[in-house]
Every structure is written in structure tokens, then in C-alpha cells.
């Protein structure tokens, strides 16, 4: 009996990480307040909305909308993640995103552009249900 319990515990320990690495779905609409620092435009905040429209395995695509003084902007992005979603990265035509999945419905992101007008922005986003 004791051997069966030890075997069951060992089996759970081996299967636990595999179960944790099952596919993570980012599809949906995520919103939150962003804060940005830029060389030219300075500091700015506002609403950010990330919409992941499609996901195939660990790769995904979508767009990020944000509000500015000049009006709303919408930029397409493409991304991928490691098994289990521990490391998530993305890119658009100008910069690079890094993501951290806090829980099933909370996603932190930062975005960076380099060059003559560098900028960095970060936000905590919550998935709308």
C-alpha cells in the first residue's frame, strides 16, 4: 500500500509540469492603463486595449489600440510563447513587446522602441469576460 502511495505521488510530480505546460490561450480583449516615457513626447498615460484575434499553438497575432491626444491609434502585432506561457514576446513594425501572464485573466506588458525617438511603455491588462 505504501509503495502505491509513493508511486502515485511520484507520478503526479512527473505529470504536474507537463500539465502546467499545456497550451495557454491569450485570445480575447485585454484592457488597462498604460504609462509611457519617450525621448521626444515625454511622459504620457492612457487606456491600452490589446486584442488577440488568432492563436495557433503558441503563436498569436492581434493588435494594440491606445488613446492619445492626437486620437486613437491601432497597431498590429505578432507574438509567440514558450510552453506553458512562461516567456511571451511580440513585435510590431517598430518595436518589441514582452509579456508576463500573471494569471488566466491578467497580463502585464512592456513595449520598447529604439532609435532617434526611443520610448518605453508598460501596463497591466485585464481580460474582458
Describe the role of every protein-language-model region.
Residues 1-7:
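Bacterial N-terminal signal peptides that target proteins for export
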Residues 15-17:
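N-terminal signal peptide c-region/cleavage motif recognized by signal peptidases
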Residues 19-31, 53-57, 127-129:
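N-terminal helix-cap/turn-to-beta initiation motif at the start of protein domains
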Residues 22-44, 109-113:
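Tryptophan-anchored aromatic micro-motifs
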Residues 32, 60-64, 86-91, 107-113:
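Short hydrophobic/aromatic-rich beta-strand segments that constitute the beta-sheet cores
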Residues 41-80:
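N-terminal glycine/threonine-rich, aromatic-flanked beta-hairpin/loop signature
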Residues 56, 83, 103-105:
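Residue-level recognition of beta-strand termini and adjacent short loop/turns
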Residues 98-102, 107-119:
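Short, exposed beta-strand-loop hairpins at the edges of beta-sheets
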Amino acid at each position: 500500500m505504501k509503495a502505491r502511495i509513493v508511486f502515485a505521488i511520484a507520478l503526479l510530480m512527473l505529470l504536474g509540469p507537463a500539465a502546467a505546460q499545456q497550451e495557454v490561450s491569450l485570445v480575447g480583449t485585454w484592457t488597462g492603463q498604460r504609462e509611457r516615457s519617450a525621448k521626444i513626447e515625454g511622459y504620457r498615460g492612457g487606456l491600452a486595449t490589446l486584442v488577440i484575434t488568432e492563436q495557433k499553438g503558441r503563436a498569436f497575432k492581434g493588435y494594440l489600440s491606445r488613446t492619445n491626444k492626437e486620437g486613437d491609434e491601432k497597431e498590429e502585432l505578432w507574438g509567440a510563447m514558450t510552453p506553458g506561457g512562461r516567456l511571451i514576446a511580440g513585435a510590431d513594425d517598430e518595436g518589441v513587446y514582452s509579456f508576463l501572464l500573471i494569471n488566466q485573466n491578467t497580463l502585464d506588458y512592456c513595449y520598447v522602441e529604439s532609435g532617434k525617438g526611443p520610448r518605453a511603455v508598460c501596463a497591466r491588462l485585464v481580460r474582458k469576460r
